Amino acid sequence: MSTTSLQHFPHSYSPFSSSRSLNRMAQSQTSGLDTLAEGSQYALEQLQMSREAAGSGEATDSVGKPKDQFQVDNDNHHNNHSLSNFKNPSQRDPLVEARSTIRKNSASAPVRRRISRACDQCNQLRTKCDGQNPCAHCIEFGLTCEYARERKKRGKASKKDLAAAAAAAAAAATNSGQPNGSSGKEDAALVGGHTSPDRRPTINGRYDPAFEVPRNLNGSAQHSEASGMVGMQNSQHLPPHSQSSMGGGLEGLPLNGYNGLNDSGRPSMPVPELQSLHMLHNSHTNPRSPSSILTHHRYNGGYNDSAYSLMNPQEPNSTSISHFRLGSSTENPPNSFLGLSPPAQSPGWLPLPSPSPANFPSFSMASFSTTLRYPVLHPVLPHIASIIPQSLACDLLDVYFTSSSSSHLSPQSPYVVGYIFRKQSFLHPTKPRVCTPGLLASMLWVAAQTSDAPFLTSPPSARGRVCQKLLELTIGLLRPLIHGPAPGETSPNYAANMVINGVALGGFGVSMDQLGAQSSATGAVDDVATYVHLATVISASEYKAASMRWWTAAWSLARELKLGRELPPNTPHARPDAERDGDPDADLSKRHPPPLITSMGHGPGNTIINITEEEREERRRLWWLLYATDRHLALCYNRPLTLLDKECEGLLQPMNDDLWQAGDFATYRQAGPPVECTGHSMFGYFLPLMTILGEIVDLQQARNHPRFGLAFRNSAECEAQVLEIARQLDVYAQSLKEFETRYTSSLALGAAETEAAMDGSHPNHVSPSGRSSSTVESRVNESIVHTKMVVAYGTHIMHVLHILLAGKWDPINLLDDNDLWISSESFVAAMGHAVGAAEAAAEILEYDPDLSFMPFFFGIYLLQGSFLLLLTADKLQGDASPSVVRACETIVRAHEACVVTLNTEYQRTFRKVMRSALAQVRGRLPEDFGEQQQRRREVLALYRWTGDGSGLAL
């Protein structure tokens, strides 16, 4: 064996030897020297000095010996030589004697060593790591344990390294046209298991450590690499297993001249310099590492038919369409470089902060199809790999679709105000709905707000950190207000369409001819839903004014997509009669009806798009959800309406949620905004109330008009509108009674449940929390309770709308009573509705003690229904009637429950105000009575509903 081959067997006591070499040497030593080797730095230095003294002789004697014999001779030689370096015990000084005794006594005790490197998860969580692969912490919490983080060195690079890097960059640029440009020097570097200093990856002539290959190869990987390279030197070919494992890097890939990747406005970066991908084959000892699930196959020359440039990190939404691929898709499945953490420091061509997962390009996801519980998450997995584990992502998707009731669908998350999508379409194991990564990230973000997963609760700061990263990822993938086409979907005249009448519109979505692709049309609807998720959570926080930016973007994009209009009906051959029967979950033709050839009417020319019946219903439900929130927020923030009734007068009303989730698409439905209660979901009982509220908002805006308001308030037209709105409220009240009668009849409901249980046609949407209710009787009782709860909520909001119809929205104007409204008949009628609303609130607390049924919507109606009670308590004090006192007590209890469920500042503030007023009603007048009244006015003055007031938006 040549001298060069001996370089792969470092000396046992070399400070640069691997841990495997140290362990092999230690086993051949005596116990005393074993202790010295492990615990004495002094002995290690002495042995190193002896090795340097006899280094030349050892190299000569070892030539020609087998590897095992060389190891034995080497160990024995150093054992004898090292013993000669120690003095007789009688000649040692007392300090050395004491140290030797301590070392001998501690030989049996375990030696604690400080690990050189923690795994990426433990480093991110600041958790103690044992340095194993996988480590104990990741095994306990089911995390992906990897060591992909780059090793950093303090200080700047030396001039010698910079010069070598510049020379290497020049050499790489010269040899960029050679597909197989690896030389013998590069092979020698591969044999050594590392890259030589003159071959370090460079960018623009400077060394960039972000692409350096990690040096922490384990022992088995080093041994296999060494043996493979020795065989290559002897027989001039690699063993089969060495070829499949890619050797030591990507230098040997036949890329047919495409190893230089060029992007617009970006310097070229050769593919061989992407040596950070080399870390993938070094972690095959970890079954959870990405390389353990890579499909090894032979790389063919050339690139795929898709875009073959690295995605712009500032446009992460484009990564879901075009991926960086190696090999041909027709012959080989694309390799999945998954779970790869982004580099800790951005390279020179990546002007972004790190380590945001949205900045890292995503890759193909085929290898996760056998292990991922919900394949719908494939598009977002590369972006969340460094944020949450896959198992938690699947659990969060379950949380998003979890229902709090087993009888009727009711979202458990307070931030899911209504179901827009079908649960079965998302969670289908083989053919899920095609979603944009931004929508999936927003769903995970919404679910993470309330999930009880240990990953989000320990430590206490984990939820905030994860939610912040998911929020940044969602916004990065959504690209707010920039909804241009993804690479590969751009039409030839897209650049020309981006300039209209001399105005460069850029990527702000004005030219919509890119909707010619089905994925773009679906992606546009997904973007609206993503805006809804962002706006909902922000509206429920203390930053209510900031939420209007997201709501405005959602309303504008929905109007641009014409979601308020019905698409042309199905063609006769779109859905044969033979496909109408069967199980909706098993019959994929029923779950995904045949596409409809329709015209979207966007852009300069109409584009043909395939629209399924399920996608049509998603468009309807998304519009009606935005329609309801527009009216709700108009009351909350004292603003005019954005979406008009005229825009959706021909749009079909939403389906019943139970039928929608079961996939039974109804054929006959009414069109236009509803005014009657039809179901248990938000679309059934709350949407009609919002239709009526929109008319009240328009009436109030006309009353408060700065120039025409006074004349309108005294006109007959105003009185006619008030009477018409009151009539619609009476119609809703009657429909609410009929709804309660229809769903609370025990015999009818019990028979229906029994029949459904026998024929197995009951919709399968039972939540995990409600699966214990297995008998028909328990489902009947739960359905009755759920119906009564819906009726109580509907009754309360209906009474509040009667109060709002009177026009007294502002609490300060009520307390001032400048127009003596408190002595009018209108006040008496409104006061009766205030007491009725308090009684309905008492029923709500009976059926829903924590007010978790609709916490996002309920707060403002509870507040507006309480202003008249506050006025009565403030004016009458101890002379208030018992019904008013009970109503005040109920309102205080309801506000306390709201604070627990969805904690907001205005609810905490008004709870204190009502408690102070209730104490006065009961006769407990404080000494500083006038001061407390003034303090109440100051608090209420923060929330104004006057002409220039902003309501709850502080």
UniProtKB/Swiss-Prot annotation:
Provide the primary localization. nucleus
Compositional bias (Basic and acidic residues) = 64-78, 574-590
Q: Where is the composition biased (Polar residues)?
A: 22-33, 82-91, 174-183, 764-777
Chain intervals with Low complexity compositional bias: 8-21
Report the protein name in the record.
Xylanolytic transcriptional activator xlnR
The family assignment reads: Belongs to the xlnR/xlr1 family.
**Which top-level group of life is the source organism from?**
Eukaryota
Q: Where is this region: Disordered?
A: 1-39, 51-93, 173-226, 312-332, 566-607, 758-777
Q: Which InterPro entries match?
A: Transcription_factor_dom_fun (IPR007219), XlnR/Xlr1 (IPR051439), Zn2-C6_fun-type_DNA-bd_sf (IPR036864), Zn2Cys6_DnaBD (IPR001138)
> Signal sequence span per UniProt?
none
Subcellular location per UniProt equals: Nucleus
Coiled-coil region list:
none
